[in-house]
């Protein structure tokens, strides 16, 4: 048996990624030199650290259950071991001794009962339920009258999976599960003009899935392998694909990777150009509406505007003092960026300083989004607040405090001024590690609905194109569809892995979701 520090570090790194601690994972990866190890991450299955810990725990429990002569105790352990208990020798020895004493007591009781039975063989049998119960106590593991199991239990801090109402549950016939990725799928996005779904994964590939009705009944996939040049050859980068975005006419797909490169692909899967100027992983990238520029944010503390036609960097913006986490265009040449430095900068192509800087968050700013009119900027943070900013003032317009844990992402509804649904009020959705989604009336600065069916952190929210529905995805493996006016749950689907991303197609009749177990699912919401 051999265990190297590189192997341990890699499993810890993957655990941090899979658990949503992306910033911690990045920092740990740098300090432990993960990128310099020779471990092929695409071959390591999801949840590998948990799996090996469970096996180790089972080994310790088996060790407790074996006699000194090698024979196995006949019975179950008194109580399931926790992971912390298993690494404490005193606890293990105490459990082992208690187990032996309990078995000795059971054997003594059995012998006494046998003797008593022999002595009273001619007595009348007990007829009352209480007496019968006393004579036949439930064995460890059998159910008692009230349905509770006899004996002690391991404590589970997670709630049981919520029962899904049959009226809202999406049947398997309406769910298509797309398999092919060999690692967790961090992101997915529909083509804006056709039913092509793009996905990005930890297996160093993006994929384009054809879900159009005329695609021969099934779904075909194009594999977009992210390679780097080594010794004159293209070799897999073995780095996560963590961001992707279609241009507005659906002809090109941009991807961002932990290998530090952004790439542009055609819709038929051919690599059009590679954009290389970041010094480290890319956390976010976005096309502008016109389709001539791509914007990227990197761990190197910079943001870059790229010329989509030539692949050249038009301008690099080095204003953050820590990794840049998200970017969003206000118009075709002006954008906002946020960072772990707690600041938000608004920058413009051609300007060598930010045109505006917003300060007020007291922890990392995870996401930023301009409203459809480009007048208001929303931001969310690990400080548990959601803030609304205007270019007309320095202080935030609203400081919305209701979540009890970090807010991971936010989305504006496609309603109100400057949208195709101008007669509907604009809303803002926020998704948090407190397992809730909140819908906000931004004009009044109040929470309209708190959506509480999820049992684990919520990583993604997305509005339907008409703004009438909101999809949410959580690490509890569930995708929920909500009515935005009433706040009621209208559809629900339980997948096979924690949900990292949800997205709607352009018609608003399909929802895509990407998961931690490598699956991508498509939910057909047509009647």
UniProtKB/Swiss-Prot annotation:
The F-box-like domain, residue ranges: 41-86
GO molecular function, one term: DNA binding
SUPFAM superfamilies: WD40 repeat-like (SSF50978)
Assigned keywords, A-Z: Acetylation, Activator, Isopeptide bond, Nucleus, Repeat, Transcription, Transcription regulation, Ubl conjugation, Ubl conjugation pathway, WD repeat
GO annotation, cellular component aspect: nucleoplasm; transcription regulator complex
PROSITE patterns tied to this protein: LISH (PS50896), WD_REPEATS_1 (PS00678), WD_REPEATS_2 (PS50082), WD_REPEATS_REGION (PS50294)
Record annotation: effect of changing residue 457 to R: Does not interact with MECP2. Affects recruitment to heterochromatin by MECP2. Is efficiently incorporated in N-Cor repressor complex
InterPro entries xref list: Ebi-like (IPR045183), G-protein_beta_WD-40_rep (IPR020472), LisH (IPR006594), WD40/YVTN_repeat-like_dom_sf (IPR015943), WD40_repeat_CS (IPR019775), WD40_repeat_dom_sf (IPR036322), WD40_rpt (IPR001680)
SMART domains in the record: LisH, WD40
GO BP annotations, alphabetical order: fat cell differentiation; negative regulation of DNA-templated transcription; positive regulation of transcription by RNA polymerase II; proteasome-mediated ubiquitin-dependent protein catabolic process; protein stabilization; regulation of transcription by RNA polymerase II; response to estrogen; response to steroid hormone
Residue(s) carrying N6-acetyllysine: 102
Main location: nucleus
Expression sites by tissue: Expressed in the cochlea.
Modified residues (N-acetylserine): 2
WD repeats: 180-219, 236-275, 277-316, 319-359, 360-399, 402-450, 453-492, 494-526
Glycyl lysine isopeptide (Lys-Gly) (interchain with G-Cter in SUMO2) cross-link, chain position(s): 290
Location of the LisH domain: 4-36
Region (Disordered): 127-164
Gene3D superfamilies, per the entry: 1.20.960.30, YVTN repeat-like/Quinoprotein amine dehydrogenase (2.130.10.10)
General function of this protein: F-box-like protein involved in the recruitment of the ubiquitin/19S proteasome complex to nuclear receptor-regulated transcription units. Plays an essential role in transcription activation mediated by nuclear receptors. Probably acts as integral component of corepressor complexes that mediates the recruitment of the 19S proteasome complex, leading to the subsequent proteasomal degradation of transcription repressor complexes, thereby allowing cofactor exchange.
PANTHER family registered for this protein in UniProt: F-BOX-LIKE_WD REPEAT-CONTAINING PROTEIN TBL1X, WD40 REPEAT PROTEIN
Domain-level remarks: The F-box-like domain is related to the F-box domain, and apparently displays the same function as component of ubiquitin E3 ligase complexes.
Protein family (similarity comment): Belongs to the WD repeat EBI family.
Protein name per the record: F-box-like/WD repeat-containing protein TBL1X
Organism: Mus musculus (Mouse)
Lineage of source species: Eukaryota, Metazoa, Chordata, Craniata, Vertebrata
């Amino acid at each position: 048996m051999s265990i190297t520090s590189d192997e341990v570090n890699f499993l810890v790194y993957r655990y941090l990624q899979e658990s949503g601690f992306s910033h911690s994972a990045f920092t740990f990866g740098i300090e432990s030199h993960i990128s310099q190890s020779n471990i092929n991450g695409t071959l390591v299955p999801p949840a590998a650290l948990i799996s090996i810990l469970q096996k180790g725990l089972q080994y310790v429990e088996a060790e407790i259950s074996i006699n000194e002569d090698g024979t196995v105790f006949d019975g179950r352990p008194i109580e399931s071991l926790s992971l912390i208990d298993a690494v404490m020798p005193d606890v293990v020895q105490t459990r082992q001794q208690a187990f032996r004493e309990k078995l000795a007591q059971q054997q003594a009781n059995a012998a006494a009962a046998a003797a008593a039975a022999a002595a009273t063989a001619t007595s009348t049998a007990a007829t009352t339920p209480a007496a019968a119960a006393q004579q036949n106590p439930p064995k460890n593991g059998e159910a008692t009258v009230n349905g509770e199991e006899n004996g002690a239990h391991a404590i589970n801090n997670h709630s049981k999976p919520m029962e899904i109402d049959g009226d809202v549950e999406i049947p398997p016939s309406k769910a298509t599960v797309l398999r092919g990725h060999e690692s967790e799928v961090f992101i997915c996005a529909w083509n804006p003009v056709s039913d092509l779904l793009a996905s990005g994964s930890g297996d160093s590939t993006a994929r384009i899935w054809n879900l159009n009705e005329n695609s021969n009944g099934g779904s075909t996939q194009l594999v977009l392998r992210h390679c780097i040049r080594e010794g004159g050859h293209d070799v897999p980068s073995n780095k996560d694909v963590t961001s992707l975005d279609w241009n507005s006419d659906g002809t090109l797909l941009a991807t961002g990777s932990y290998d530090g490169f952004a790439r542009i692909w055609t819709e038929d899967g051919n690599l059009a150009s590679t954009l290389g100027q970041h010094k480290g992983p890319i956390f976010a990238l976005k096309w502008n509406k016109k389709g001539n520029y791509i914007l990227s944010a990197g761990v190197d503390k910079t943001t870059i505007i790229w010329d989509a036609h030539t692949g050249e960097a038009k301008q690099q913006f080095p204003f953050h003092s820590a990794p840049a986490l998200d970017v969003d265009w206000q118009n075709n040449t002006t954008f906002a960026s946020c960072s772990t430095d707690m600041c938000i900068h608004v920058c413009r192509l051609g300007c060598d300083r930010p045109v505006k800087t917003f300060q007020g968050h007291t922890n990392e700013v995870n996401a930023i989004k301009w409203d459809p009119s480009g007048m208001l900027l929303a931001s969310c943070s690990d400080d548990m607040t959601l803030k609304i900013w205007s270019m007309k003032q320095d202080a935030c317009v609203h400081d919305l405090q209701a979540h009890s844990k970090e807010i991971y992402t936010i989305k504006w509804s496609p309603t109100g001024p400057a949208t195709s649904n101008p007669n509907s009020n604009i809303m803002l959705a926020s998704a948090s590690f407190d397992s809730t989604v909140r819908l906000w009336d931004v004009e009044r600065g109040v929470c309209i609905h708190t959506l509480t069916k999820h049992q684990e952190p919520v990583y993604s929210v997305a509005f339907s194109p008409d703004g009438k529905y909101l999809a949410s995805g959580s690490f509890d493996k569930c995708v929920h569809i909500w009515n935005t006016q009433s706040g009621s749950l209208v559809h629900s689907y339980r997948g096979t892995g924690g949900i990292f991303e949800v997205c709607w197609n352009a018609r608003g009749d399909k929802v895509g979701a990407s998961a931690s177990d490598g699956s991508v699912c498509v939910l057909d919401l047509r009647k």
